[in-house]
Amino acid sequence: MIHCKVQQWSPQYLRLPATGYEELTLTLNTSMLARMPEEEDQLFLVVGDSPSSTYVDWGEDCNSTRYPSYDHCTHKILYLGASAGTTRSKRLSATIGIRLSKGTGSNNVLGTPMYLLYNEMKTRIIESSK
């Protein structure tokens, strides 16, 4: 299971519908991102609740207007640091949009919990919500 450092955050999982696309907007506010260590500058969206879970491709801009279609599990990183042209102060509020569609076989994420994480060790900082 994914370790949750912030114990007061209760699990709220995103459950995708049985068919079609689901558009998500993840709003990261100051209190959430302030929990990230200063040296961290990237976020991961993980499908499932296991450390070995795969990642969703969702672009690399912290205010992305791109909505990649999800049809297979890929490992992509959302950068909130210099690579995205942001600074520590600018990253304290960000809204990210992604679009996911039904996968096939083991890549099917429908009804699967999703987590937004801030490091490779899979430390959870916030769960996704509709």
Curated annotation (Swiss-Prot):
pH dependence statement: Optimum pH is 7.
Supply the EC number(s). 2.1.1.318
Q: Which reaction does it catalyse?
A: [trehalose-6-phosphate synthase]-L-cysteine + S-adenosyl-L-methionine = [trehalose-6-phosphate synthase]-S-methyl-L-cysteine + S-adenosyl-L-homocysteine + H(+)
Is Methyltransferase tagged as a keyword? yes
Arranged from A to Z, the UniProt key words for this protein are: Methyltransferase, S-adenosyl-L-methionine, Transferase
Spans through the membrane? none
A single GO molecular function term of this UniProt record: methyltransferase activity
**What class does this enzyme belong to in the EC scheme?**
transferase
Temperature behavior of the protein's activity = Optimum temperature is 30 degrees Celsius.
Q: Which domain of life is it from?
A: Eukaryota
Q: Tell me one GO biological process term.
A: methylation
Q: What happens when the gene is disrupted?
A: Exhibits almost 50% reduction in intracellular trehalose concentration.
Q: Does the keyword Methyltransferase apply?
A: yes
- Reported function: S-adenosyl-L-methionine-dependent protein-cysteine S-methyltransferase with broad substrate specificity. Methylates trehalose-6-phosphate synthase (TPS), enhancing its enzymatic activity and promoting trehalose synthesis upon entry of cells into stationary phase.
Q: What is this protein called?
A: Cysteine methyltransferase
